[in-house]
Amino acid sequence: MSYSSNTKNELARIEGEQSCCVRAELAALIRMSGTLQLVGSQKLNIKVTTENPAIARRLFKIIKKQYNIHAEVMIRRNARLKKNNYYLLVITHSMGSSEVLADLGIMKKVDDSFDITYRIPQELTQNRCCKRAYLRGAFLGGGSVSDPEKTYHLEFVTHHKELSEGLRDLINSFDLNAKVVERKGNYVVYLKEGDQVVDLLNIVGAHSALLDLENIRVYKEMRNNVNRIVNCETANLSKTVDASIRQIQNIQYIEGSIGINRLPDNLREVAELRVEYQDATLKELGEMINPPIGKSGVNHRLRKLDQIADRERGKSI
């Protein structure tokens, strides 16, 4: 099961919410994944679809608890897309769909017609707990979060621009930085940074998913740090090996041209040690010299040998 599905399963099992929060969550869930079906003069059915059985159970329970309505539940096979079954919950006009829509701020009856609104009702999101519940419902109905092993990305998808802007503003009321982009005829509200995704998961109550993400972040950071250290050490080792090869080649050239014995004692000693101990570091070479000298002193003498080799090569041209 995907990380996003696990997150939704966790959210679908949250219990003990107040009535105001249940209304906010239900309003968002119906708005994000529901459709309205006109079945007669001023008669509407509410249809909500989901592929997640935990969300279907939650919908059924909160509709029954809040409105004492036993929604009709059907299981459909998505044969065309060859995906999992999906669940269809229906609240018919006779069950009280109009009353539910009005209570959730989705529909208002004006004279002999319906006024469907796509704004987020302020009366449902006045309290901070209700704002959290609305975002939880929006995520259950039309949200997803990427596998944190790959990237940090959380989004809500809706057909309606006004709703997307309302979601963005509601998310940003928690000091986040959600943005809206149009994609293939839909409006996508998204967060991209790891810290922002963590904060949103905390807001909606997905604490287990949050901990999983944080554990993955720590692991990835440790892995990246190890890789950086290894790469740095590999690069340094490569430089050391290249320098050692160059120094030995220069010493061998000096031996073949003027002879190492003609070098000053301090340079001759370093040259002989460098050839004998080809894998030794500058520090180790310095400790072999009598009296011992530091890395900078060894490096200075080796550079002198490089200069002598270059000078002798110039004479042979």
Swiss-Prot record:
Pfam family for this entry, one: HTH_WhiA
Residues within the DNA-binding region(s): 281-314
GO molecular function, one term: DNA binding
Gene: whiA
GO biological process terms on file: cell division; regulation of sporulation
Superkingdom: Bacteria
Higher taxonomy: Bacteria, Bacillati, Bacillota, Clostridia, Peptostreptococcales
Disulfide feature: none
Family: Belongs to the WhiA family.
Alphabetized UniProt keyword annotations: Cell cycle, Cell division, DNA-binding
Protein name per UniProt: Probable cell division protein WhiA
Protein role: Involved in cell division and chromosome segregation.
